[in-house]
Amino acid sequence: MNSSMIAPAALPIEVDLDLIRRMDRNGPRYTSYPTADRFVEAFDAETYRSWAVRRNIGGIRRALSIYIHLPFCSTVCFYCACNKVVTKDRSKGEKYLQYLFREIDMQGPLFRDDRVVEQMHWGGGTPTFFTMEQLSELCDHLKRHFQMSRDGEYSIELDPRSIDPSQMQVLRGMGFNRVSLGVQDFDADVQRAVNRIQSEEQTLAVMEAARGAGFSSINVDLIYGLPKQNLLSFNRTLGRVISAAPDRIAIYNYAHLPTRFKPQRRIADAELPTPDVKLKLLGLAAQRLKEAGYVYIGMDHFAKPDDSLAIAQRHGHLHRNFQGYSTHADCDLIGLGVSAIGAIGPTYSQNHRHLETYYDALDRNMLPVARGLELSADDLLRRAVIQSLSCQFKLSKRSIEIAYLVDFEKYFQEEMTDLKQMVLDGLVELDDE
């Protein structure tokens, strides 16, 4: 029997409905702690500049990571909560690039020439809204201002609907060696419900071309909890994705927040799976991927055992940041583009979220930093706890006490009390360590 056609009823997925009801609450994915809603406008461009310069001082050469936000999409996906601009006017993309070049011109001199870029990610939006010539021009502009590592990890998000497979070789020539493909779900009913019609053939053709071009890692994004999704249809999607054998698979939870994200108002509440079905969808995915040999990295990520994320996890070097899971824990992150988030030393910063204010700041020769945060000692301590739990699924109380000079049980007295019910529910194990 074709493994992609196994009936979900045959899969031992059991759900404690009472536990779901008690634990069903919204919460952050913790790509950062504190989360972005804690950022304040008092952290401005000058604060950012002073921290960037301060990080150059001393004998330690800290590596750099770069995130570039390319916000344009030609069509809207109803589930999307990203900062995006939906347009078919390509001239808007060219204008954006010219302003992005100006930001790069201002950011580059803030960092010492010997600080090498070891990691870079381009996200959106849809980066391939831009032509290959425009993307190549952006690459060249970056290289004029930043020293790129020869063996760095350079990734780009792709919409298989907006790129010809032959262009994968062009992207590889620019220096990209990792690619992330948005799939979400192959089921036709689900695709119509979220306004993202994307054939399996399109996706597989891009994946095959990426392998042929020499990309070292291919990631596929899926979403569970979308309208019209059910166990049978999602099981088929999982089977097809597993057969394509990407190196990494991210399975994100759909958060339905129509009051915050206007496109989500096009999704009917009645078509969304219930919380218990959502959990079964996640359980189904975890089981299918485990059976296929993938390693659970954490939160929403799975990877093949020989992938760098799985290797880093085994050696205790895994890290989580605004770009998701990463093997580069010690990099200062530079965010470029509208709404982009950076992390320099013990600070976070975010650029203006709207094109008009982003452009206005650059027209005034100012870095387009809108807000940010300097982390307190408490923030740093709690971030370390969350990092350990997110990346290693465990926490050494003693290591926290040594690193932060606290009595763990006293410092987290309230939290330890809250954990008691989770222990009784079998969700958490506690010991003296």
Question: Language-model segments: what does each one mean?
Answer:
Residues 68-84:
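Local cysteine-cluster metal-coordination motifs and their immediate loop/turn environment
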Residues 423-433:
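A short, conserved structural fragment
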Residues 57, 63, 86-110, 115-409:
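C-terminal scaffold of the Radical SAM
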Residues 16, 26, 45, 260, ...:
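Alpha-helix initiation and N-capping motif
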Residues 407-424:
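Short amphipathic alpha-helical interaction segments
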Residues 70, 336-338, 432:
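Pocket-edge structural micro-motifs
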Residues 1-65:
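Flexible, acidic/Gly-rich N-terminal and inter-domain linker regions that tether
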